[in-house]
Amino acid sequence: MIHMTDTFEKTYTDWSIDVGEYKYEGITLKEVEQNLYSIQDNDMDFLIVSPSKAISVGNKLYNFVQVCSDQHTELLHIEISVTNDGEQGAIIYGKNELGHQEVLQIIEDFIAHHKVPTLDDWEIVLDLRPKMESYVKGTEND
C-alpha cells in the first residue's frame, strides 16, 4: 500500500518550480506545499509548476499550473494552461478563492497521476490562440 508520504517525498525529476527569483528542476510535493504557504503569507508572489513536456490528457495538452494569492484574501487563485490538440496557442483557465488543500490536491493529481480537473466551472482568464481559427481549420465551416 502506498502512503501519502511516498508521493509527498518523491522527487519528480521532469517537473520544475518557478517562483520568479529562481527556478529549479526536480521537485517534491512537499516543496510545492511550502511554496503555497509562502504565497499565503505574502512571502512570495506566485508559483509555476510545469512538466518538461506538456501532459497529454484526452485531446488536450496541459502546459503548466500557476498559483498566486487571491487578492485581499487568505485564499489562492489557480490557473492551468491548456492547448487543444492541433491548435496553436494556449487557453489559460483560472479559478478563484481556493483553499490551500484544494490547490495542493489539484497539483498533486497533476504531477503524480497526470489527472486534471474538469474545467467546466473554471473561467477563461486568457485566450492566446490566434484569431484565424476558421481560416486555419479550412473547410469545416463551409
Language-model segment annotations:
Residues M1-M44, I55-D142:
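Acidic, proline/glycine-rich low-complexity IDRs
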Residues L47-V49:
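A short glycine-rich, His/Asp/Glu-containing loop-to-beta-strand
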